[in-house]
Amino acid sequence: MKIGIVGLGRVGSSTAFALLMKGFAREMVLIDVDKKRAEGDALDLIHGTPFTRRANIYAGDYADLKGSDVVIVAAGVPQKPGETRLQLLGRNARVMKEIARNVSKYAPDSIVIVVTNPVDVLTYFFLKESGMDPRKVFGSGTVLDTARLRTLIAQHCGFSPRSVHVYVIGEHGDSEVPVWSGAMIGGIPLQNMCQICQKCDSKILENFAEKTKRAAYEIIERKGATHYAIALAVADIVESIFFDEKRVLTLSVYLEDYLGVKDLCISVPVTLGKHGVERILKLNLNEEELEAFRKSASILKNAINEITAEENKHQNTGG
């Protein structure tokens, strides 16, 4: 598998390392506006290949993406302490459009995973600018949020996170929606399990949801950025592609019409295999969850409209 990574900040470089450890890539091209940074990362990773599976890793340009099976986009300006993901939109949209033009030119048949925040909006801009197959362009979405929530529940209840089944959908950010109505542990509905183990109630579950939502902010306050967990999440996404696992993951995908949400990239459960997104699964949400999901979609739609209006303004004024 040939993998291209655009953007070698902490997320991009951590992702490259995670992929090397997984052993998927026979070839990995690293692209960054700071060519020396990309060269340094390539050398550092190459020196680790005696301890991993052999891989050809090098710094390159967009033209070197030719023949890539997967392209991971992690380029963008970093999130500041206290800054919401949506506030990042204006500073990253133009960067994403430029990347989209280059990826579609040199690797039009690749599967593209957008990681840069705000991931839902930037995935939408990438898709529209590139004109690529919507099944092959998606964002990392709420894969990490889902993992965080499962971990919190598992730690509290004394189970493995792998035995906890609950999804976080919607925006990867402040308006994300935990789907409690479909949550299960070992095949037992979470509400029933709570009655059995008597370790939690609705307030504790709400606290878990809030902790999941605030997790990135908490980490950023302490160390400036999140990068290890998201890198592992992206490597997990690539694993599903590489092995054609057809796993169900909450990715930010383009929706033509999903529970009333149209023309938007937002996280919902999908099956992912070697050809990209194969199926979009419609959840049976309760009224409260459906309302929250549509509200989340509305927030993202407004953000897209705002940045589009600003772009048009710049073009009309020659800015």
UniProtKB/Swiss-Prot annotation:
HAMAP family: Lactate_dehydrog. Keywords: Allosteric enzyme, Cytoplasm, NAD, Oxidoreductase, Phosphoprotein. Allosterically activated by fructose 1,6-bisphosphate (FBP). Catalyzes the conversion of lactate to pyruvate. Its EC number is 1.1.1.27. The modification Phosphotyrosine is found at Y217. Pathway: Fermentation; pyruvate fermentation to lactate; (S)-lactate from pyruvate: step 1/1. NAD(+) binds at V11, D32, R37, Y62, G76, V77, V115, T116, N117, S140. This is L-lactate dehydrogenase. One of its GO terms (biological process) is glycolytic process. It is found in: Cytoplasm. PANTHER family: L-2-HYDROXYCARBOXYLATE DEHYDROGENASE (NAD(P)(+)), L-LACTATE DEHYDROGENASE. PROSITE patterns: L_LDH. GO terms for molecular function: L-lactate dehydrogenase activity. GO terms for cellular component: cytoplasm. Homotetramer. The active site is at H172. Disulfide bonds: none annotated. Beta-D-fructose 1,6-bisphosphate binds at R150, H165. Substrate binds at Q79, R85, N117, P118, V119, D120, D145, T146, A147, R148, T226. Pfam families: Ldh_1_C (PF02866), Ldh_1_N (PF00056). The gene is ldh. The keyword Amino-acid biosynthesis does not apply. It catalyses: (S)-lactate + NAD(+) = pyruvate + NADH + H(+).
